[in-house]
Protein backbone atom coordinates (compact mmCIF):
# COMPACT_ATOMS: atom_id res chain seq x y z
CA UNK A 1 0.00 0.00 0.00
CA UNK A 2 1.31 3.45 -0.94
CA UNK A 3 2.08 5.67 2.02
CA UNK A 4 1.95 9.48 1.97
CA UNK A 5 3.18 11.67 4.82
CA UNK A 6 1.58 15.13 4.87
CA UNK A 7 3.65 17.95 6.37
CA UNK A 8 1.34 20.60 7.83
CA UNK A 9 1.25 23.95 9.60
CA UNK A 10 -1.62 22.80 11.85
CA UNK A 11 -4.37 20.18 11.71
CA UNK A 12 -7.46 18.67 13.23
CA UNK A 13 -8.81 18.73 15.87
CA UNK A 14 -8.34 22.48 15.31
CA UNK A 15 -10.97 23.89 12.97
CA UNK A 16 -10.02 26.21 10.11
CA UNK A 17 -10.31 26.31 6.35
CA UNK A 18 -6.76 24.93 6.30
CA UNK A 19 -7.61 21.89 8.42
CA UNK A 20 -10.85 21.18 6.56
CA UNK A 21 -9.07 21.11 3.20
CA UNK A 22 -6.42 18.85 4.72
CA UNK A 23 -9.07 16.52 6.04
CA UNK A 24 -10.75 16.31 2.63
CA UNK A 25 -7.47 15.51 0.87
CA UNK A 26 -6.41 12.84 3.34
CA UNK A 27 -9.86 11.24 3.43
CA UNK A 28 -9.96 11.14 -0.39
CA UNK A 29 -6.55 9.47 -0.45
CA UNK A 30 -7.71 6.92 2.10
CA UNK A 31 -10.69 6.15 -0.14
CA UNK A 32 -8.20 5.47 -2.96
CA UNK A 33 -6.41 2.91 -0.81
CA UNK A 34 -3.53 5.18 0.19
CA UNK A 35 -2.24 5.06 3.76
CA UNK A 36 -1.83 8.58 5.12
CA UNK A 37 -0.51 10.36 8.17
CA UNK A 38 0.02 14.01 9.06
CA UNK A 39 2.90 15.75 10.80
CA UNK A 40 2.49 19.30 12.11
CA UNK A 41 5.17 21.90 12.77
CA UNK A 42 5.74 24.10 15.80
CA UNK A 43 2.83 26.40 14.93
CA UNK A 44 0.25 23.78 15.88
CA UNK A 45 -0.25 25.19 19.37
CA UNK A 46 -3.17 23.07 20.58
CA UNK A 47 -2.67 20.89 23.63
CA UNK A 48 -2.63 17.17 22.98
CA UNK A 49 -0.45 14.07 22.78
CA UNK A 50 2.54 13.69 20.48
CA UNK A 51 0.52 11.25 18.37
CA UNK A 52 -3.17 12.04 18.01
CA UNK A 53 -6.03 10.55 16.00
CA UNK A 54 -8.75 12.87 14.72
CA UNK A 55 -11.61 11.77 12.47
CA UNK A 56 -9.84 8.56 11.55
CA UNK A 57 -6.53 10.27 10.64
CA UNK A 58 -3.32 9.90 12.64
CA UNK A 59 -1.35 13.09 13.28
CA UNK A 60 2.15 13.43 14.75
CA UNK A 61 3.36 16.62 16.46
CA UNK A 62 6.66 18.49 16.42
CA UNK A 63 7.55 19.75 19.89
CA UNK A 64 9.91 22.33 21.31
CA UNK A 65 10.57 26.05 20.97
CA UNK A 66 12.29 27.83 18.10
CA UNK A 67 13.77 30.91 19.74
CA UNK A 68 15.90 33.74 18.44
CA UNK A 69 15.49 36.91 16.40
CA UNK A 70 13.27 37.01 13.32
CA UNK A 71 14.83 35.08 10.49
CA UNK A 72 16.98 32.89 12.70
CA UNK A 73 13.87 31.77 14.57
CA UNK A 74 12.17 30.62 11.36
CA UNK A 75 15.35 28.86 10.22
CA UNK A 76 15.44 26.93 13.50
CA UNK A 77 11.76 26.14 13.07
CA UNK A 78 12.48 24.63 9.65
CA UNK A 79 15.36 22.59 11.06
CA UNK A 80 13.29 21.19 13.92
CA UNK A 81 10.45 20.20 11.60
CA UNK A 82 12.91 18.59 9.17
CA UNK A 83 14.29 16.51 12.04
CA UNK A 84 10.76 15.38 12.94
CA UNK A 85 10.08 14.41 9.33
CA UNK A 86 13.29 12.40 9.10
CA UNK A 87 12.60 10.60 12.38
CA UNK A 88 9.05 9.68 11.39
CA UNK A 89 10.16 8.58 7.93
CA UNK A 90 12.67 6.18 9.48
CA UNK A 91 9.85 4.61 11.51
CA UNK A 92 6.95 4.68 9.04
CA UNK A 93 8.69 4.60 5.63
CA UNK A 94 6.40 6.79 3.47
CA UNK A 95 6.63 6.60 -0.32
CA UNK A 96 5.85 10.30 -0.84
CA UNK A 97 6.14 13.50 1.18
CA UNK A 98 3.28 15.97 0.59
CA UNK A 99 4.06 19.36 2.11
CA UNK A 100 1.40 22.04 2.40
CA UNK A 101 1.77 25.82 2.72
CA UNK A 102 3.42 27.77 4.23
CA UNK A 103 6.91 27.66 2.74
CA UNK A 104 8.32 26.82 6.18
CA UNK A 105 6.69 23.39 5.89
CA UNK A 106 7.84 23.08 2.31
CA UNK A 107 11.44 23.95 3.16
CA UNK A 108 11.57 21.41 5.99
CA UNK A 109 10.06 18.71 3.79
CA UNK A 110 12.45 19.52 0.94
CA UNK A 111 15.43 19.17 3.26
CA UNK A 112 14.19 15.78 4.49
CA UNK A 113 13.20 14.60 1.01
CA UNK A 114 16.66 15.29 -0.39
CA UNK A 115 18.38 13.56 2.52
CA UNK A 116 16.16 10.47 2.39
CA UNK A 117 15.58 10.26 -1.36
CA UNK A 118 11.78 10.53 -1.12
CA UNK A 119 9.70 12.34 -3.79
CA UNK A 120 8.18 15.64 -2.65
CA UNK A 121 4.84 17.17 -3.63
CA UNK A 122 4.48 20.81 -2.57
CA UNK A 123 0.97 22.27 -2.33
CA UNK A 124 0.54 26.04 -2.29
CA UNK A 125 -2.75 27.22 -0.82
CA UNK A 126 -1.80 30.90 -0.69
CA UNK A 127 1.24 33.11 -0.90
CA UNK A 128 1.50 33.87 2.77
CA UNK A 129 3.47 37.07 2.26
CA UNK A 130 0.57 38.45 0.20
CA UNK A 131 -1.95 37.20 2.77
CA UNK A 132 -0.01 39.09 5.46
CA UNK A 133 -0.32 42.27 3.41
CA UNK A 134 -4.04 41.63 2.97
CA UNK A 135 -4.72 41.14 6.67
CA UNK A 136 -2.55 44.04 7.77
CA UNK A 137 0.27 42.07 9.42
CA UNK A 138 2.83 42.57 6.64
CA UNK A 139 4.06 45.13 4.14
CA UNK A 140 4.61 44.54 0.44
CA UNK A 141 8.27 44.46 -0.64
CA UNK A 142 9.50 44.52 2.96
CA UNK A 143 12.53 42.38 3.79
CA UNK A 144 10.31 39.71 5.34
CA UNK A 145 8.03 39.78 2.28
CA UNK A 146 10.95 39.29 -0.12
CA UNK A 147 12.61 36.58 1.98
CA UNK A 148 9.35 34.65 2.24
CA UNK A 149 8.94 34.79 -1.54
CA UNK A 150 12.53 33.66 -2.07
CA UNK A 151 11.95 30.69 0.24
CA UNK A 152 8.79 29.77 -1.66
CA UNK A 153 10.68 29.90 -4.95
CA UNK A 154 13.39 27.66 -3.48
CA UNK A 155 10.87 25.01 -2.42
CA UNK A 156 9.02 25.12 -5.75
CA UNK A 157 12.29 24.68 -7.64
CA UNK A 158 13.26 21.66 -5.55
CA UNK A 159 9.90 19.86 -5.41
CA UNK A 160 9.15 16.94 -7.72
CA UNK A 161 5.61 18.22 -8.28
CA UNK A 162 3.76 21.42 -7.41
CA UNK A 163 0.05 21.91 -6.72
CA UNK A 164 -1.86 25.19 -6.37
CA UNK A 165 -5.47 25.70 -5.35
CA UNK A 166 -6.32 28.08 -8.21
CA UNK A 167 -5.26 29.36 -11.62
CA UNK A 168 -4.15 32.70 -10.19
CA UNK A 169 -1.47 31.11 -8.01
CA UNK A 170 -0.29 29.00 -10.94
CA UNK A 171 -0.09 32.06 -13.19
CA UNK A 172 1.97 33.87 -10.55
CA UNK A 173 4.47 31.00 -10.39
CA UNK A 174 4.69 30.84 -14.17
CA UNK A 175 5.44 34.59 -14.23
CA UNK A 176 8.40 33.84 -11.95
CA UNK A 177 9.78 31.35 -14.46
CA UNK A 178 8.30 28.07 -13.21
CA UNK A 179 7.42 25.60 -15.98
CA UNK A 180 3.61 25.47 -16.25
CA UNK A 181 3.79 21.73 -16.97
CA UNK A 182 5.12 21.16 -13.44
CA UNK A 183 2.10 22.77 -11.80
CA UNK A 184 -1.25 21.07 -11.22
CA UNK A 185 -4.38 22.78 -9.90
CA UNK A 186 -6.48 21.22 -7.14
CA UNK A 187 -9.27 23.69 -6.33
CA UNK A 188 -11.24 23.83 -3.13
CA UNK A 189 -14.53 21.98 -3.13
CA UNK A 190 -17.38 20.83 -0.96
CA UNK A 191 -18.61 17.30 -0.29
CA UNK A 192 -22.35 17.86 -0.26
CA UNK A 193 -22.89 14.48 1.40
CA UNK A 194 -21.37 15.89 4.60
CA UNK A 195 -24.26 18.37 4.85
CA UNK A 196 -26.98 15.72 4.77
CA UNK A 197 -30.50 16.47 3.58
CA UNK A 198 -31.26 20.17 2.91
CA UNK A 199 -32.98 21.89 5.82
CA UNK A 200 -36.28 23.59 5.11
CA UNK A 201 -36.25 27.39 5.15
CA UNK A 202 -37.17 29.01 8.46
CA UNK A 203 -39.64 31.86 7.75
CA UNK A 204 -39.09 33.39 11.20
CA UNK A 205 -35.32 33.50 10.70
CA UNK A 206 -35.74 35.00 7.23
CA UNK A 207 -37.89 37.74 8.69
CA UNK A 208 -35.52 38.38 11.60
CA UNK A 209 -32.58 38.79 9.20
CA UNK A 210 -34.63 40.77 6.68
CA UNK A 211 -33.77 38.34 3.87
CA UNK A 212 -37.02 38.71 1.96
CA UNK A 213 -38.52 35.83 0.01
CA UNK A 214 -36.03 35.38 -2.83
CA UNK A 215 -32.82 33.34 -3.13
CA UNK A 216 -30.13 33.92 -0.50
CA UNK A 217 -26.42 33.97 -1.28
CA UNK A 218 -24.43 33.16 1.84
CA UNK A 219 -20.79 33.73 2.76
CA UNK A 220 -19.07 32.13 5.74
CA UNK A 221 -15.43 33.05 6.14
CA UNK A 222 -13.19 36.00 6.98
CA UNK A 223 -13.46 39.66 6.06
CA UNK A 224 -10.13 40.26 4.37
CA UNK A 225 -9.38 42.05 1.11
CA UNK A 226 -8.24 38.87 -0.64
CA UNK A 227 -11.57 37.07 -0.08
CA UNK A 228 -13.20 39.00 -2.94
CA UNK A 229 -16.21 40.28 -1.01
CA UNK A 230 -16.04 43.56 -2.93
CA UNK A 231 -16.79 41.59 -6.10
CA UNK A 232 -19.76 39.89 -4.44
CA UNK A 233 -21.16 43.25 -3.32
CA UNK A 234 -20.70 44.73 -6.79
CA UNK A 235 -22.43 41.72 -8.35
CA UNK A 236 -25.63 42.00 -6.30
CA UNK A 237 -27.22 44.80 -8.42
CA UNK A 238 -26.45 42.75 -11.54
CA UNK A 239 -27.97 39.62 -10.01
CA UNK A 240 -31.13 41.54 -9.15
CA UNK A 241 -31.68 42.04 -12.88
CA UNK A 242 -31.96 38.28 -13.48
CA UNK A 243 -32.98 36.89 -10.09
CA UNK A 244 -36.10 38.13 -8.31
CA UNK A 245 -35.27 39.82 -5.00
CA UNK A 246 -31.91 38.19 -4.18
CA UNK A 247 -30.42 38.61 -0.72
CA UNK A 248 -26.89 38.23 0.60
CA UNK A 249 -26.05 37.03 4.10
CA UNK A 250 -22.53 37.17 5.58
CA UNK A 251 -21.26 35.34 8.65
CA UNK A 252 -17.70 36.48 9.26
CA UNK A 253 -15.37 38.87 11.05
CA UNK A 254 -12.22 40.70 10.06
CA UNK A 255 -10.37 43.97 9.74
CA UNK A 256 -12.36 45.29 6.75
CA UNK A 257 -15.82 44.60 8.16
CA UNK A 258 -16.70 48.31 8.41
CA UNK A 259 -15.59 48.85 4.82
CA UNK A 260 -17.99 46.17 3.58
CA UNK A 261 -20.82 47.67 5.62
CA UNK A 262 -20.23 51.04 3.96
CA UNK A 263 -20.17 49.39 0.53
CA UNK A 264 -23.44 47.65 1.28
CA UNK A 265 -25.12 50.87 2.40
CA UNK A 266 -23.91 52.66 -0.72
CA UNK A 267 -25.81 50.12 -2.85
CA UNK A 268 -28.97 50.10 -0.76
Describe each model-derived feature in a short phrase:
Residues 66-96, 107, 115, 146-150:
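An amphipathic, basic-hydrophobic alpha-helix
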Residues 196-211:
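A short helix/loop element that forms part of the nucleotide-sugar donor recognition site in Leloir-type
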Residues 1-64, 239:
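N-terminal subdomain of nucleotide-sugar transferases
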Residues 3-7, 211-236, 249:
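Conserved donor-binding/catalytic core segment of Leloir-type glycosyltransferases
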Residues 42, 168, 189:
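Carbohydrate-associated surface elements
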Residues 77-83, 119-121, 129-154:
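Nucleotide-sugar donor phosphate/pyrophosphate-binding loop at the beta->alpha transition
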Amino acid sequence: MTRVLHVLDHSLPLHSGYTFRTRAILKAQQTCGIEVRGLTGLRHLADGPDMEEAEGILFHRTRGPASGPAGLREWREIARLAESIEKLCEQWRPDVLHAHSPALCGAAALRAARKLGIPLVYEIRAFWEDAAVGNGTGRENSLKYRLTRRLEDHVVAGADAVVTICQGLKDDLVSRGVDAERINISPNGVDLALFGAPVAADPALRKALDLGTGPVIGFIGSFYDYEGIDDLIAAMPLLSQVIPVPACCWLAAGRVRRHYRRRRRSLA
